[in-house]
């Protein structure tokens, strides 16, 4: 076995903050493994986790309120460095004998804190030097309560006019607390502060790299699977593509992929998947042409939720049929990633951050008699992409925009027909091609075309015609929870519109969606 890339790890306790996963991603980017757990983790579990350091994340609760969340006592007795962020700093202060109270002035957004000399966490880290010689840090605040009395043996690290104790430290025990959020980009020195804590103070080695992750995953898959066979539903999306590349490298011909072409994919996507995996990489891929089956089941159905269920259930039926044809398959591979694992790890008190989980591989039936292989379950999406590059997958495949599970089925409003899908495929391909040519594909988070089954008047030569409408959608977002419409140049939109109308029959009008999320969703259905 190669070196243990989990040997040096950080424990992050979640108190319900929207930023908790962002903290974890920042720690991973530094090159150190970490896990997110609910704040009510048992003391023995904290001890058994054996962290090199602990981060107490933020949260929406109020420390002075009865019954508000507290960190396990083992956090402060284990003898490892502890870093409290926002709520994490407040509960640290309260639990160690300090005092927290509600503030008359709530701080949300940009703030500038005055640094006090001494503690190692901020040593030689600042954004500006004031005229009076005081070092200043530009940070992002989001809090109502504040620490008014520090615990014994703590010293002041930073302050603002409205928050006299903006950061505190117990250097002997290596306990640190900050009232701001170092994990967000608005805190300009946040990365350096986190790195100072994790690498310098906790003493973690930076073992968590794409090359090490790939080698570790390959060895773990070989150990788990042995000489048995593995089945994977290959969709062409990022997660399943990386799983396919990883397992092929680990177990070779023991892997069989089933690629279901449902007739709702992007232009030439089926051929591209086969060329990449079957032809170039030598992966064993069974391609199932199920377009007629899917479109037949979708006939006369206009309700978006019913369309989703039909597409999902039909996929399960097709995959199940193919699976039963294969003999001696013991394992089913899935592209579960770390956010899926976090989302289902609900705290027993219900106060930790819980988002609805989603099922991989279309929600395969529970009665399938396979053992699960989930090689990506420790990784965030950005780590999956980096792993894909490490495994030799092309950049354009690994960093392509998200595509919904039901495919074009939810980008054709109302009933799905082959004619509509063929028109939409071509319009979408033109849009994406021109975005790439203009250098805008990487600037947008998601871009696609939508088919509207309504007819609008157009003029061709001396004649009028009634043809269909296509809408273009492009958004910019960090987390897909909120998004703003992309302000594409008019010249680019004009070129895309002209090509779609001139090159594709039965389109008379192209529109651009200028709705942000909320209130609109990113997809139209």
From Swiss-Prot:
PROSITE patterns: GATASE_TYPE_1, GMPS_ATP_PPASE
Keyword ATP-binding: yes
Catalytic reactions on record: XMP + L-glutamine + ATP + H2O = GMP + L-glutamate + AMP + diphosphate + 2 H(+)
Keyword ATP-binding part of the UniProt annotation: yes
InterPro entries: Class_I_gatase-like, GATASE, GMP_synth_C, GMP_synth_GATase, GMP_synthase, GMPS_ATP_PPase_dom, NAD/GMP_synthase, Rossmann-like_a/b/a_fold
Annotated ATP binding sites: 235-241
Domain of life: Bacteria
The protein's annotated pathway: Purine metabolism; GMP biosynthesis; GMP from XMP (L-Gln route): step 1/1
Enzyme Commission code(s) on record: 6.3.5.2
One GO MF term: GMP synthase activity
UniProt keyword terms in alphabetical order: ATP-binding, Glutamine amidotransferase, GMP biosynthesis, Ligase, Nucleotide-binding, Purine biosynthesis
Any one GO CC term of the record: cytosol
Active site (record annotation): 86, 181, 183
GMPS ATP-PPase domain residues: 208-400
HAMAP family linked to this entry: GMP_synthase
Described purpose of this protein according to its UniProt entry: Catalyzes the synthesis of GMP from XMP.
Protein name according to UniProt: GMP synthase [glutamine-hydrolyzing]
Source organism: Marinomonas sp. (strain MWYL1)
Upper lineage: Bacteria, Pseudomonadati, Pseudomonadota, Gammaproteobacteria, Oceanospirillales
Gene name tied to this protein: guaA
